[in-house]
Amino acid sequence: MTLAKHDSYDIVVVGTGAAGTAAALEAAQHGASVLLLEKGRHTGGSSNYTEGLFAVDSYLQKAQNINVSATDVLKEEVDYSKYRADSRIWRRYLDDSANTVQWLKDQGVEYEGVQAMGAGEATWHIYKGMGQAVLHDALQPQAQKLGVELLTSTTAITLHQATDGAITGVMIQSAATNETQVINTAAVILATGGYLNNPDMMQKLTHYDTRRLIPVSSGKGTGDGLRLAWQAGAQQYGTGMAMLFGGYLKDPSEPSFKYMASQMETAAGQQPLLWLNEHGERFVDEAVVYNFSYAGNALYTQNQVFSILDQGVINKMAQDGNFMGLGVYVRRGEKMTKLQAEIDAAVAANKPFIFKANTIEALATKMHLPVDQVTHSIQTYNQYCDNGQDDDFGKNPEYLVKVSQGPFYGFELNVGAFCTMGGLKVTTNNEVLDTTGQPITGLYAAGNDAAGLTGDTYGPNMPGTCVGYAFYSGRNSGRHAAQYTHQQSIVSH
C-alpha cells in the first residue's frame, strides 16, 4: 500500500501552515501537480493562531487613507536588524504585500480591518476567524479543488538529489505505520515553521536560557525542514532568533497556551507596571512592553523577574481598562472584568507563578526576595509616582502607578516565544542556497525556515510581518517552483 496516490508530483510541499498552504495553492494555480505533507494529524500548525498580516498600500489602507511608505518601512526594518536582514527580500515582500492581501481576499478570506500595535504603524490586517479560518475555510479547500493532494501524519525524511545536487525526489513516512514511499519530484518547498519546539536545536543554535523560555505554539516546529536542507548541502544561516513576546506565566501542569487569552497573563506580563529582579531591584523602564520583543530581551537580562501589582491597579484595569493588550486575544484598553476572578483562582490553586500577601514585606518573603531591598525599591518607585517623574529610567508619567493598596500580588515572569525565524539562506525567489552561495536546484524554503527578514530581534512595530512573509514567501516559492518544473517538463519532452 502506498501513502500518496501517485509516485510522481511536480512539487512536494512540506508543512501546512501559512507558508506551505499558500505555496501549494499558488503552485496549483500555476498548473503544477502538488503533494502537500503535514506531519501532525491536524493542518495549519502555529499559523492557526495568527491574527493578521502586514501590508502596505492595500485596498483596506487606501479606503481609510492610511499612507505608509514602503521604502521607509524597508529602511526602518533593515536598520532595526542591524543590517542582518536582506534589503532585496524586504523590497520584494513590501512591493507584493498589497497583492497578498488581495489574493487572500480572492480566496475567500474576510478582514476585520487594519490597525497598529504599540507605537507602530497601521499595517496589521486582521482577518476574521484568525489563521484557522484563513487556512481551513479558504486556502486549503481552494487548494484541494485544484487537485492538491494532502497527506496528514506524514513526514518527509530525506531528500533525493542528482549528482549535481538537483532535487529528484523525497522519501516520506507514515507516522501511523512507519511505511515509507519515495516520491519523484523536481521541486521541494520546505515550510516547516522553524525549530522553537526542538530543545536540542534551541540550546545549540540560540543564546536563550530554554528553562525560562515558554514556547506558545502548535508544538510541531522541530526544525524538520532545516535538517532536510542542511543534509542536502544547504548553508546554515540566520539562526539564533526567536520571536519573544515579553513576560509569560509558567505553569508546568498546563499546556503553554493555557494563559494566552487570559486577562491575568496580560495584566501580569504585558503592562508597563513595576518589575523587580531577583535582588528586589527595579532594572528597566517597564514601558518596554510596548515592543514585546524588546520586553523579552529585557527580561532575559535578569535571572528572575517579578511583576508587582496592588489591588488598586487591579481595580483600575477592571473598571477603566488595561494599558496594553496582547494582540486580538486581549484588546488594548479592554476592561479586565475577569481579572480578579482569574487571580483568585490561581491563588486558590497555589499556582507556582503567583504570590499574594497583605503587606509588601510579607510578599517579598513569599517571593524569596530580600525584604529590605524590595521595600526600598517600592518606596522609591512610589515617590517617583507622586512626583510624576521616573528619575531612574525615565518612564512615561502616564504609567507611573503607585504600589500602595493591599493586598499585593507578585507574578514570576518567564519569557514567551511564538516561533524561531531563519536557518536557510534564500534568494529573492526563495531558492535555498548551498554553502558556496549557489542555489540548490529545485529546493525552496518559505516562512520561518527562510532567513533574511530579521536580525536578532523581531520588529513588532510593523505587526504581522512574520505571517505576512509566510504567505508571501509561500506564494513566491510556489510560483517559481511551478515555473521551474514546467520548464523541466518541456525539456524532458
Swiss-Prot record:
Q: Which residues form the signal peptide?
A: none
Gene inactivation phenotype reads:
Mutant lacking this gene is unable to reduce 4-vinylphenol to 4-ethylphenol, while its ability to reduce hydroxycinnamic acid is not affected.
Q: Which cofactors?
A: FAD
Enzyme Commission number, as recorded: 1.1.1.-
Keyword set for this entry? FAD, Flavoprotein, Oxidoreductase
Instruction: Give the Gene Ontology MF terms in alphabetical order.
Output: steroid dehydrogenase activity, acting on the CH-CH group of donors
Induction section of the entry:
Is up-regulated (four-fold) by 4-coumarate (4-hydroxycinnamate). Is also induced by its substrate, 4-vinylphenol.
Catalysis: reaction(s):
4-vinylphenol + NADH + H(+) = 4-ethylphenol + NAD(+); 3,4-dihydroxystyrene + NADH + H(+) = 4-ethylcatechol + NAD(+); 2-methoxy-4-vinylphenol + NADH + H(+) = 4-ethyl-2-methoxyphenol + NAD(+)
Taken from the record, one Pfam family name reads FAD_binding_2
Q: Which domain of life is it from?
A: Bacteria
What does the record list as GO biological process? steroid metabolic process
Give the protein's biological function. Answer: Involved in the production of ethylphenols during the degradation of hydroxycinnamic acids. Catalyzes the reduction of vinylphenols (4-vinylphenol (4-hydroxystyrene), 4-vinylcatechol (3,4-dihydroxystyrene), and 4-vinylguaiacol (2-methoxy-4-vinylphenol)) to their corresponding ethylphenols (4-ethylphenol, 4-ethylcatechol, and 4-ethylguaiacol, respectively) in the presence of NADH. These compounds are considered the most important flavor components of fermented soy sauce, and, on the other hand, are considered off flavor and responsible for sensorial wine and cider alteration.
User: What family is reported?
Assistant: Belongs to the FAD-dependent oxidoreductase 2 family. FRD/SDH subfamily.
Query: Which protein are we looking at?
Result: Vinyl phenol reductase
Q: What's the source species for this entry?
A: Lactiplantibacillus plantarum (strain ATCC BAA-793 / NCIMB 8826 / WCFS1) (Lactobacillus plantarum)
Gene name for this UniProt entry: vprA
